[in-house]
């Protein structure tokens, strides 16, 4: 029975006793009026005597205190003895008072023996009290007995505080000691709920070797220079690396050595048409066997970043023997909801593999989890508390950690915020020391950093963060123009403002090609006498001379191509205008970096067209809040809408963000830019009567000669076959499509068989004789129709690269 129930019972009894008391008093009042009056007088006299005794006792205590002050100081032992004696006296006095009070209450509520008049009716209260059996235990006495200790403690403290300072100090010390003891017990009870495991000494344990390095860098990635890799990481949302010997990032799923059916599954089921920035760098690093710390915002594809390497790691290890429960890989999640979500993703990836997984979370059926663990599982997704519960069952003999060689901590910052650090550390102390640990987090607080330094072996810290890629002293601006004519007018208005300034503030205008540079120079000559232009098509002496004049002339203007942005270092440049908006993050950073050199400040202005979605995406990523606050609200809204449209296209595979590697014209985002350049050429050609040839994508009336059919092989299997005729394509296009590196990359990415067949016929020597060998073509074969079609798309992309190269070659041969 709880204290609340006892209190309720006490109140009910009190109510019944009060009722009986009132009845008994009524009877006594009618029969013994005289006796009551005498008894009342006696009570008044006794009350007065009690008060006098209290006054005498108070005076006596006061005299004792004064005498104590006059006597010499006592020793500590005497003080302690005196305090204990007085404390005992106070306790005994309080007990006597409480006993008297309880007896008085009993007397007040005693039921008369007879309700009718008797010879003993004239009894006094003292006589009645003598007849009461005080040895009988009363329920009310029992209740007071239960709470007596607490009440005595409180009365004791109050009495000591009023009467004796020494007793108060001693009592406070006892109270503080009691509080400390209670806190200690509460802490011990709390720690009791946190189960920790005993560390394992692996020195005397013979462990099976594990395979961790499962990645071979493709030749395509090896061919990149260090500067190109730096630009690539900059394009990929400004990836930052801390650590030594980090593998280079990849740009395609096929470069990871993953089978095509897995690649297609990832693209179709997980909707990752291309790798996200965090995936491009962390997957090669984890597959190389390194401990990795991945820091990226939520929703950036971190789950796939560790699931793919984890599954490959599990497949590379020895299978579980009979009687081994596993697991080989463990994923820790902070919440059961996240653990269930991760398990669903794992189930999708291992559906066709000989791998099993289990989700171990609190609140779920423990018996089912135990039964499944007994059969053996390779992957465990768990919350730390439940996993330790499983490891502690049956004296720690149910689940063994000896086979664990891959550990993942997802959302590590939340894991540690929830207080799971001791549990995870306890588990890791039971796992083999040569394990591979992967840690992913949206933030990287100090407690996560300290944990990583203790349990991870020379980790690579990979941070994806687009913020901060542009110099903080650069004020970034933009203008969205309706068409090319409007953009040129905007350029003129900007230059007009700049020319009116008296301070030497130079301006650089970046354009996308040599042809546009020449056209803009011709049109701007009438507006400024301080205009100089340089590009790679000009003789070296002319470029050097124009650059020197630009440096010496105040308020001068330099017109150049994007390629020249790296080699320019003019401290006086205070403004940069991107007439043709940047195609890549690296290009934007290098172009805007020509201003705000040293400790100076500068401004960058980007001129965009409504169809340049990729440029809007780059600007939206690179600009800071303070930059947006200085731009018109309507312009900012339009820019964000364009950026969101491009981001949606990235997820659906409609668009691809250029990385500046692999040639131009491959990405869908570049088509709009090439179209806008053609529009500019057409307008300027009519206005200035200038004949120019602009780079094009593909001829408008051009069509590829392809045919796809389904055939049945001799063994009964059905295959898809495609003939891609390359005979009639320009020479540079054929070379680009059929060179060994292109063919090997496509075979690795699609899994198709690609062979070159037929013979080459010049355009003037084509025969229709069926007996002759067919025209030169590529034969593409695969059992999967989608793989064949994907291979055809890659061939068309290579053809576009070839057309771009052919056009550029023609321009170089005919311009001068």
Swiss-Prot record:
Keywords: ATP-binding, Helicase, Hydrolase, mRNA processing, mRNA splicing, Nucleotide-binding, Nucleus. InterPro entries: DEAD/DEAH_box_helicase_dom (IPR011545), Helicase_ATP-bd (IPR014001), Helicase_C-like (IPR001650), P-loop_NTPase (IPR027417), PRP5/DDX46/KHDC4_KH (IPR056149), RNA-helicase_DEAD-box_CS (IPR000629), RNA_helicase_DEAD_Q_motif (IPR014014). Residues 490-640 form the Helicase C-terminal domain. Residues 1-48 are annotated as: Disordered. It comes from the Eukaryota. It is an enzyme of class 3 (hydrolase). One of its GO terms (biological process) is mRNA branch site recognition. Residues 1-24 have a biased composition (Basic and acidic residues). Its EC number is 3.6.4.13. Residues 283-462 form the Helicase ATP-binding domain. The keyword Nucleus applies. One of its GO terms (molecular function) is RNA helicase activity. ATP binds at residues 296-303. Its main location: nucleus. A motif (DEAD box) lies at residues 410-413. A motif (Q motif) lies at residues 251-280. Residues 29-46 have a biased composition (Low complexity). It catalyses: ATP + H2O = ADP + phosphate + H(+). GO terms for cellular component: nucleus. It is found in: Nucleus. ATP-dependent RNA helicase involved spliceosome assembly and in nuclear splicing. Catalyzes an ATP-dependent conformational change of U2 snRNP. Bridges U1 and U2 snRNPs and enables stable U2 snRNP association with intron RNA. The Q motif is unique to and characteristic of the DEAD box family of RNA helicases and controls ATP binding and hydrolysis. Belongs to the DEAD box helicase family. DDX46/PRP5 subfamily. This is Pre-mRNA-processing ATP-dependent RNA helicase PRP5. It comes from Candida glabrata (strain ATCC 2001 / BCRC 20586 / JCM 3761 / NBRC 0622 / NRRL Y-65 / CBS 138) (Yeast). The gene is PRP5.
């Amino acid at each position: 029975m709880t204290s609340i129930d006892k209190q309720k019972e006490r109140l009910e009894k009190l109510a019944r006793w009060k009722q009986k008391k009132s009845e008994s008093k009524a009877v006594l009042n009618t029969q013994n009026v005289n006796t009551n009056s005498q008894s009342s007088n006696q009570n008044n006299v006794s009350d007065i005597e009690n008060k006098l005794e209290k006054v005498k006792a108070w005076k006596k205590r006061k005299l004792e205190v004064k005498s104590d002050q006059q006597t010499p100081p006592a020793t500590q032992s005497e003080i302690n003895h005196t305090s204990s004696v007085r404390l005992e006296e106070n306790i005994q006095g309080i007990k006597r008072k409480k006993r008297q009070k309880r007896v008085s209450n009993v007397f007040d509520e005693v039921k008369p023996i007879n309700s009718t008049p008797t010879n003993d009716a004239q009894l006094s209260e003292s006589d009645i009290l003598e007849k009461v059996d005080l040895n009988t235990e009363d329920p009310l006495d029992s209740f007071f007995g239960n709470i007596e200790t607490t009440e005595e403690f409180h009365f004791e403290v109050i009495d000591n505080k009023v009467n004796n300072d020494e007793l108060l100090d001693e009592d406070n010390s006892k109270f503080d000691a009691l509080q400390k003891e209670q806190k200690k017990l509460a802490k011990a009870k709390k720690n009791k709920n946190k189960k920790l495991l005993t560390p394992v000494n692996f020195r005397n344990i013979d462990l099976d070797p594990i395979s961790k390095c499962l990645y071979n860098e493709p030749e395509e990635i090896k061919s990149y220079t260090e500067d190109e890799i730096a630009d690539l990481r900059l394009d990929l949302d400004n990836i930052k690396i801390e650590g030594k010997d980090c593998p280079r990032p990849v740009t395609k799923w096929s470069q990871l050595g993953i089978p095509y059916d897995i690649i297609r599954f990832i693209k179709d089921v997980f909707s990752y048409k291309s790798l996200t920035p965090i995936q491009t760098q962390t997957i090669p690093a984890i597959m190389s066997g390194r401990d990795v710390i991945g820091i990226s915002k939520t929703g950036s594809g971190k789950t796939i970043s560790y699931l793919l390497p984890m599954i490959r790691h599990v497949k590379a290890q020895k299978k579980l023997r009979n009687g081994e429960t596993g697991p080989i890989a463990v994923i820790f999640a902070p919440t059961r909801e996240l653990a269930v979500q991760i398990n669903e993703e794992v189930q999708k990836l291992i559906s066709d593999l000989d791998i099993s997984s289990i989700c171990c979370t609190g609140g779920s059926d423990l018996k089912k989890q135990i039964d499944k663990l007994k059969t053996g599982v390779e992957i465990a997704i768990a919350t730390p508390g439940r996993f330790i519960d499983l490891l502690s069952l049956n004296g720690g003999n149910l689940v063994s950690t000896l086979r664990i060689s891959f550990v993942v901590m997802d959302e590590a910052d939340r894991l540690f915020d929830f207080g799971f650090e001791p549990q995870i550390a306890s588990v890791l102390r039971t796992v083999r020391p040569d394990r591979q640990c992967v840690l992913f987090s949206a933030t990287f607080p100090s407690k996560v950093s300290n944990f990583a330094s203790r349990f991870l072996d020379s980790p690579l810290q990979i941070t994806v963060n687009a913020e901060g890629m542009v110099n903080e002293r650069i004020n970034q601006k933009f203008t969205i123009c309706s068409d090319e004519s409007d953009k040129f007018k905007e350029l003129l208005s900007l230059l007009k403002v700049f020319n009116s300034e008296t301070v030497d503030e130079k301006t650089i205008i970046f354009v996308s090609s040599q042809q546009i540079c020449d056209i803009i120079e011709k049109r701007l000559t009438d507006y400024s006498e301080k205009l100089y232009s340089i590009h790679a098509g000009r003789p070296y002496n002319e470029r050097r001379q124009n650059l020197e004049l630009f440096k010496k002339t105040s308020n001068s203007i330099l017109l150049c191509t994007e390629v020249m942005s790296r080699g320019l270092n003019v401290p006086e440049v205070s403004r940069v205008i991107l007439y043709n908006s940047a195609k890549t993050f690296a290009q934007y950073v290098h172009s805007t970096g020509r201003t705000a050199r040293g400790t100076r400040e500068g401004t960058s202005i980007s001129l965009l067209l409504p169809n340049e979605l990729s440029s809007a995406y780059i600007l939206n990523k690179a600009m800071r809040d303070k930059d947006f606050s200085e731009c018109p609200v309507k312009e900012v809204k339009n820019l964000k809408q364009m950026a969101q449209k491009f981001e949606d296209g990235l997820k659906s595979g409609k668009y691809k963000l250029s990385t500046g590697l692999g040639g131009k014209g491959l990405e869908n985002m570049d088509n709009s830019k090439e179209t806008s350049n053609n529009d500019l050429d057409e307008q300027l050609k009519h206005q200035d009567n200038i004949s120019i040839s602009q780079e094009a994508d593909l001829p408008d009336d051009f069509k590829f000669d392809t045919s796809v059919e389904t055939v049945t092989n001799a063994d009964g299997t059905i295959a898809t076959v495609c003939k891609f005729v390359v005979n009639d394509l320009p020479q540079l296009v054929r070379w680009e499509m059929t060179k060994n590196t292109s063919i090997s990359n496509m075979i690795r990415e699609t899994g198709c068989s690609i062979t070159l067949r037929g013979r080459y016929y010049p355009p003037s020597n084509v025969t229709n004789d069926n007996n002759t060998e067919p025209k030169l073509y590529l034969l593409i074969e695969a059992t999967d129709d989608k793989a064949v079609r994907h291979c055809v798309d890659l061939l068309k992309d290579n053809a576009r690269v070839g057309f771009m190269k052919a056009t550029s070659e023609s321009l170089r041969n005919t311009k001068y």
